[in-house]
Design a protein with these regions (language model features):
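Short, acidic/turn-prone active-site loops that include or flank metal/cofactor-
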Residues: 10, 31-34, 112-113, 154-158, ...
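Conserved beta-alpha-beta core of the PfkB/ribokinase-like small-molecule kinase fold
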Residues: 126-193, 215-217
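Active-site metal-binding loops of divalent metal-dependent hydrolases
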Residues: 9, 133, 244
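Conserved N-terminal subdomain of the carbohydrate kinase-like
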Residues: 23-27, 34, 49-127, 290-304
Length: 304
């Protein structure tokens, strides 16, 4: 039994600053983190930490950052045999500015100089999670194992995420993706419009959920749409919360949880993650997420 995560792999350097980033000054900071980044990579770190045999299919450069990424992933028990090092290439990197006053962040990404290539795949896997990067590899993985449940972390509307949204079992998208695809922002106070928006998303995949940050999430099941509030926590950093959400959701699906229960577990894991700084460094223990889910179970509310 194993999980295959397919997508972006990079190196994050995180600086924490008070307030917004002003122009034309020099700041001295005392907090710095360097970690593997990328939605699929962070999700793989979670499923590996939670004890599932986990494969990551991705690309890195031929540099010191690639070595640091792979070393850290091994600490999370992630199998990196299918992460390809591209000779002479630079790894993807992100400079992340964490705004201490409001727990938000600003990320500046350098995609690296990685050539496109179809990646090798493990011979067997039981759940697929893709973030829209490495499109051809994701399509190949689903074609090879058509009965394996697949999850799309759809953060934004791109050609790749639109194509994959119509192929996967579970479309778990951000409100940015949903709003862009539907042509208008998702609002919980306009049920008529929301009904149409969910129907539009639902036409692409059998299962649909939209994450709404502090407002929780909405999902469709058996013709009804439900709202699941977020767990009440004090947020200090939102970096990686969505990736951790998707990784723990994939874990729940792997473990045979129902769609709503997997979303509850994912919400609990994401809530715990924002109480710490960093992406993979904020992944909670599985027992912590399970306890929060059971002891503070958020009641879903039927919207229509």
């Amino acid at each position: 039994m194993s999980v295959l995560c397919i997508g972006q792999c990079g190196y994050d350097i995180i600086f924490s600053i008070p307030g917004l980033l002003p122009e034309n000054i020099k700041l001295r900071i005392t907090d710095k983190l360097e970690l593997p980044g990328g939605p699929a990579t962070c999700a793989a770190a979670l499923t590996g930490k939670w004890g599932l045999p986990t494969y990551l299919a991705s690309r890195v450069g031929d540099d010191i950052f690639a070595d640091a990424i792979l070393d850290k992933l091994h600490q999370f028990q992630v199998n990196t045999d299918y992460v390809q090092k591209i000779p002479g290439a630079n790894s993807s990197m992100s400079m992340v500015i964490r705004h201490c006053d409001n727990a938000n962040r600003t990320a500046i990404n350098y995609p690296g100089t990685l050539i496109d290539m179809e990646l090798p795949l493990p011979p067997h896997y039981d759940v697929i999670l893709t973030d829209g990067h490495e499109l051809n590899t994701a399509l190949d993985a689903m074609q090879r194992a058509p009965h394996v449940p697949s999850v799309l972390d759809a953060g934004s509307v791109r050609d790749s995420t639109l194509l994959l949204a119509k192929k996967v079992t579970y479309l778990v998208c951000s409100e940015v993706f949903a709003g862009s695809y539907c042509g208008e922002a998702i609002r919980l106070d306009d049920l008529d419009k929301l009904r149409s928006q969910i129907a539009s998303l639902r036409s692409m995949a059998p299962y649909v959920a939209v994450t709404l940050g502090e407002q929780g999430l909405i999902y469709e099941e058996n013709g009804h749409v439900f709202h699941l509030p977020a767990f009440p926590v004090e947020s200090v950093d939102t970096l990686g919360a969505g990736d951790i959400f998707h990784g723990s959701f994939a874990y729940g699906i792997h473990e045979g949880m129902s769609f709503p229960d997997a979303l509850q577990l994912a919400s609990a894991a994401a809530a715990l993650s924002v109480t710490k700084v960093g992406g993979v460094s904020s992944i909670p223990d599985r027992d912590q997420a399970t306890i929060l889910m059971k002891n503070n179970c958020q009641k879903n509310r039927i919207l229509f």
